Amino acid sequence: MSVYQKLLQIRNEKGAGFFVLLDPDKMDVPEIVKLAKKAERGGADGLLVGSSFLLSSRFDEAVKEIKANVSVPVVIFPGNANQVSRHADAILFLSLLSGRNPHFLVGEQVKAAPMIKEFGLEPIPTGYLLIESGAPTSVQFMSQTQPIPKDKPDIAKAHALAAEYLGMKFVFLEAGSGAENPVPDNIIRETSDLISIPIIVGGGIRSPEIAYNKVKNGASFVVIGNAFEEDDSIMQEFAEAIHVNKNVFPSPIEGGDKKR
């Protein structure tokens, strides 16, 4: 079974999947391994490893050590073509469709593709859409692109539909690491109602209640990063909120309970 198929199986069984984002720039290798093990024990379904900057030279070492210490899928979430490691299970093969910078639409992908082939990594084509979150984010600055306005769901929907028609397997709605505000529920809901491929949502999700609402509005996978760098004791609460088929989380919301 491919990693992609395994992730879909997790989504179908649990209602949604729970990813923890690990940034090698923000902690050393022993610390990142410790957090990875806590994430697995806390109910994470997979680990994303990546950084907007990658100031550290220990990316490959970090991926290798994480993989050696956990059994859940380890998936690279690359900021550029340098973030490729033979030790991962798969890589989100991102194309930044919300921007018009050819470097991140296809340039980095061309550089990374031969390495992905050589390493035998499973590429998961993913349409990456930045959504306005209230303040400039690292990925916005590094990619030199503007996010989709948070009050323009039709623009987000058109980009997501284009991603599906281009053959992407996921759409990633991204508010940005440490975002002031997460992706709005109505954008998730309306996009989910329009497209047939799974939606990943990340950025600015600081509480289990927020995570739950993202799932109930159509997110198939939720990514949490900064919240655990500050307090890793709440991982299980996030897992219970995201795994809506296994737990009843008391947070009523409006709309968006898409069939899966």
Predicted regions and their residues:
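Hydrophobic faces of well-ordered beta-strands that scaffold small-molecule active sites
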Residues: 18-22, 47-49, 74-76, 91-93, ...
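N-terminal amphipathic alpha-helix/helix-capping segment at the start of soluble metabolic enzymes
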Residues: 1-22, 115-120, 124, 132
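Alpha-helix-loop-beta-strand connector modules within alpha/beta enzyme cores
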Residues: 59-80, 181-206, 238-246
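Active-site mouth loops of central-metabolism enzymes
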Residues: 16-32, 137-155, 201
